[in-house]
């Protein structure tokens, strides 16, 4: 056999359901890589003969290998700070009250409009490095802090540029319908003005995004303080006509039926979903839409309404765990902490949490045929951890357990 590298003396949490073991585990295992893909994996005793002198061999010393982690929901490119709003919330102001008073997303919009691409790139690079140090190999980055054509394009350009200069793969999402900008707010004609902004998103922003090939998907914030069902459907229809995947912020603060609409239109995921009901869960199950859990926002906003975890299990909806890294509701740049929070706050099992940041996260980004679990033919994105069981990744936080990271067959962290 001719391989580019071989890993021995490892235990592998493949996260491959076909293995039939918790975590898709193969103990006392080995794995071979060729041309950036996994060429062989299985018990060490069954490893075929290969040219030891011509092949780099890495010894895992009995440690665990997992797929590279995938953060499927971030707002990583932004400028400014909202620490003052943190203080206001601790004094009793709600997220909705701050947003309606012109804070929240709108304050970050102002900072992003004023920042240039170089500043945004450097801020994004620092945050991406922080995630990469925790074993993240793929990240989704949304726009949504521009709310005008120029700034939305600027944010997406920076996200694309980060992907060109970093080993972490970047999937970009156009979130022009994140909030209604101040220039379109009119209390006397709120629906009419927000409809006019949706016109801008659909007729001008999206074509400009497509002209520069800046987005892989389109997202909308469907809530009482943002966009209604009819407006969401308009954006989704335009996105699908443009050939883009769709996903939705839904049921975070209330339930207006966004998840059912997203499911009907074939969305990859619905995200937040604290107020999701059984009808919505059933719709997700029938459409194969993923449920993205964002424990960082739940924690930071001190929410009390839990996502319907038992219903999601009952209907076998793929559960994803993501950081939602953003300046207002989840300024926590740690994917590993999200694994712990998903277990402690939402009562996921450690296996469910890890699946939520690997195999299910890949599904939520539409890349499950290439990454997210370890099997022959899959891209060789994986991490070696100094742990005695895969459950330790969700159990304990704060100690650096990452030993190695391999990205597309190349050792990028050692």
Curated annotation (Swiss-Prot):
GO cellular component: cytoplasm
Binding site for N-formimidoyl-L-glutamate: 145, 326, 328
GO BP terms in the entry: L-histidine catabolic process to glutamate and formamide; L-histidine catabolic process to glutamate and formate
Pathway: Amino-acid degradation; L-histidine degradation into L-glutamate; N-formimidoyl-L-glutamate from L-histidine: step 3/3
Cofactor: Zn(2+); Fe(3+)
Binding site for 4-imidazolone-5-propanoate: 82, 145, 178, 252, 329
Residues reported to bind Fe(3+): 73, 75, 249, 324
Co-factor remark: Binds 1 zinc or iron ion per subunit.
Enzyme Commission code: 3.5.2.7
Compartment(s): Cytoplasm
Cross-referenced HAMAP family: HutI (MF_00372)
PANTHER family (UniProt xref): IMIDAZOLONEPROPIONASE, IMIDAZOLONEPROPIONASE-RELATED
The protein's name in its UniProt record: Imidazolonepropionase
Organism: Shewanella denitrificans (strain OS217 / ATCC BAA-1090 / DSM 15013)
Organism lineage string: Bacteria, Pseudomonadati, Pseudomonadota, Gammaproteobacteria, Alteromonadales
